[in-house]
Amino acid sequence: MDQNGASTEARSKRKQPPTSPSTDRPLKQIKPEVDAHTRNGVPKSPELEVVDDAHSVYSLEEPIAPVAGAVHDTAEWQKTIEGVVKSVVSIHFCQTCSFDTDPAISSEATGFVVDAEKGYILTNRHVVGAGPFIGYCIFDNHEECDVYPVYRDPVHDFGILRFDPKAIKYMSVSALQLRPDFAKVGVEIRVVGNDAGEKLSILSGVISRLDRNAPEYGEGYSDFNTNYIQAAAAASGGSSGSPVVNRDGFAVALQAGGRADGAATDYFLPLDRPLRALELVRRGEAVTRGTVQTQWILKPFDECRRLGLSTDLEKAVRTQFPKETGMLVAEVVLPQGPASTKVEEGDILIKVNGEFITQFVRLDSILDDNVGKTISVTIQRAGENLEVELDVGNLHDITPDRFVSVSGASFHDLSYQQARLYAISLKNAGVFVCEAAGSFRFADGYASGWLIQEVDNQPTPNLDTFIEVMKKIPDRKRIVIQYKHLRDLHTANTSITAVDRHWHAKIRIATRNDKTGLWDFKPIADPVPAVPQVSRRANFVKMSSNYPNAVDIVRSFVRVHVSMPIKLDGFPKMNKQGYGLVVDAEQGLVLVSRAILPYDLCDISLIIADSIFIDAKVVFMHPLQNYVIVKYDPALVNAPVKTPKFATEFIRKGDETIFFGLNQNFRPVVAKTVVTDITTVAIPASAITPRYRATNFDAITVDTNQASHSGSGVLIAEDGTVQALWLSYLGERTSHSGKDVEYHLGLATPNLLPILNEIKSGKTPKLRILNVEFQTVQMSQARVMGVSEDWIEKTEQADPERHQLFMVRKVDSGHGGDGMLEGDILLTLNGKLVTRSPDLDVMYNNEFLEAVIVRKREEKTIKVTTVATEEIETDRMVSFCGATLHRPHQAVRQQISKIHSDVYISSRARGSPAYMYGLAPTNFLTHVNNIPTPDLSTFLREVKKIGDNEYFRLKVMTFDNVPWVATMKKNEHYFPTIEYVKDDTEALGWKRIIHECEDGGAREEMAIDNEAGGDEE
């Protein structure tokens, strides 16, 4: 922070592309990465890249590697490629919400047509995803059509998409024939796909292995129980789902993954199981998938011998399969599964139903053909043969195909993928949290991966039980939740949360529909009304101190928890907590920092005396000085809450005072200290994401390190008179770390007394402000800028402590009218010399001010119009295609020179059309289909004319005045248009309106994730 509020952050002046540049693209996998430890803007732990073999790391996402040595293309290859490219499509898609192992994302990949008549495309399972999917494909001639999931394998990395062949009018669609039997060591291949996000890339290689185990990709989706094919082709991002073709033009494998360390090695999925699935889908039959809930891996004979493989058995296997070099060994056996008491880790698989088994393909085939039946399995353990009977389960039954949304979060049963990774039982494991938000946003920070064990002291072993428990819980009831994280199943966590059934009223269930390719949403429970709060008794802690009157201020502090269902105004969080100061105990008025409570579309909960929970409502928000007044019902509080005495005189530099604060651990701290400085500061503006910041105020600093660790507190005299408030001030987001800076500073109490007295009298202050941001100039600067010696002398006499004047640093845009200009030096307002921030307070109650200024070395007297603050706060927002739109808030007007439109993008949801087509926070939407949209009403009117799944044009202006045009496709199923309007007649203070789509989809509940500078969407 500096005196001028300068910030070193930089925003890209150009528009953001729909996807990241290829250098930032996550390669192979579809999840764009910004750096080595982030996934699509969400911090990712380094340990997510799991070592498969010694010193080897494999990833669905790998950095772009140098292309392997190109093989000279013969005429035969050229003819083959010409035919293949007509079957290859570029897939642009969104996984619209977090589900199982997959976060909500928007990206690109590759697929290829495998049935031109019925319209089937083969691609990867990590492209199709386990959850809701929307996407379209682009053919070689740039014709486009929508695609819908038909099948995604529960384990193996392939999925099948459906398209309408009739939609392709200008080229003959051809299909590639799947020939898994042609994949052999030494075969020359080409990978034809959307490599590194480019339209078409053709990479060459030679198959080197057919028998490597499936690579582990970490905590996300991983394939297993199959062998992979290895080749050096150096494919990268966007190549997921590419066909691997031989010289004759047959697809011999499916591109799936590769190395994360820059090596050119690639891993392909064999096509045996995709071919079987395709044939069943063609016939309209169900794709049966069997399992004994055991992961097998291929181990060479030397390792098998160490595990106890007998010589006789090795000889028998080698004789029957002379080309085999290993056998299948049990790696993970799930507890309470079909094999849990019969098969152990390290057991060598010998026979199934009397047949020697050495390959995954044959094992898969037997299991898939025996779902619901019993198979006979021979294993060898420490040299001893064992015969066991195993019941074959249905793999689809342990793969979630539904999720429930309640209180802003989403849940489903634990999946086989997660259970296999952590070797835990699928039975009664608890409910998996796939989107930890709303009432279930736990303080530990993980967005998913939680297993809910108990809710409101009732066990929740599975999703159905969880739904029944949640149906009965009233709105706003505080409940106890017990939960574990998959990473640490040893630790049971306990939290208390308030159940939100008002912002997120209905419990809704989403079920996968493989016929339509969509997920069907259905409300299953209306909210149970809240139980009225009752009066409760409590006592405050008593602190022993040398300053008993001062520490008694502890009776004036209450803990504040703010929960925001929607991100507005560029604010980076959806939950904040801190402390507030009771300013009137009789009326229940509490002062809170705007770094904790940025806007009034929220739930405010106070904890009084660390004992009583009570709800509060916003009464007043100060536009400049960083505080909010909230009100609770004092009749519900039977506790000795104290109204402090406030000083009417400004504290001065050098004065002794007592610092009383609440530190990061919410513990009170006391220290005798001295005021080191009182200066007019400028909180740095956040260039990446404009959000509320205090301006034009004098900040107090003190000589104690406790102050820097305390976000709330007071400076108080020994007799208990509060001299200043100690508040948190939200600052800039640093460009190097992406973290938000908070400053802790003091605000003298005389600044707030006039407003506080007005609120106490029952009035709501209607302030007027100057639409400018000032910075201080010293006399040396003022003289150069044209301030006369007379005024310099008057300044020095009027304020012996601070020889300074105010210069206009920035004029807020969008308010219009004549007034001060940037660079003007302010001398007087209504005849009073202005040398300190409190001298500006005359603006609060005057529509017009007479100002004496120096402009370009000329002294002038001008009439300045102040701006009413009633409309400064955001009072209306629209969620459209995943973008949160509202009028540019005050922070935007403070930073920008021209307001292009009153339709401003504040945030966007991952996996949404807004994200997919490149709309970014801080953009302005100025036209819809060439019709100007200067405000939200016009915008809503125009977008209502657009049909579902229909393309439209948006004219967009970036924050830095660069215009561009976006073409988007509307999606009402998953992203209905929802409007929130401030309405004091509503119980919540806001009215919710759903436009067009009454059922709503994955984002109807409005727990929209923000996108701010690529760090948080």
UniProtKB/Swiss-Prot annotation:
Gene3D superfamilies: 2.30.42.10, 2.40.10.120. Residues 88-278 are annotated as: Serine protease. Its main location: nucleus. Residues 25-38 have a biased composition (Basic and acidic residues). It is an enzyme of class 3 (hydrolase). Its EC number is 3.4.21.-. Keywords: Apoptosis, Hydrolase, Nucleus, Protease, Repeat, Serine protease. GO terms for cellular component: nucleus. One of its GO terms (molecular function) is serine-type endopeptidase activity. Residues 1-46 are annotated as: Disordered. The active site is at residues 126, 157, 239. Residues 305-383, 879-960 form the PDZ domain. Pfam families: PDZ, PDZ_1, Trypsin_2. One of its GO terms (biological process) is apoptotic process. It is found in: Nucleus. InterPro entries: PDZ (IPR001478), PDZ-like_dom (IPR025926), PDZ_sf (IPR036034), Peptidase_S1_PA (IPR009003), Peptidase_S1C (IPR001940). Nuclear serine protease which mediates apoptosis. Belongs to the peptidase S1C family. This is Pro-apoptotic serine protease NMA111. It comes from Phaeosphaeria nodorum (strain SN15 / ATCC MYA-4574 / FGSC 10173).
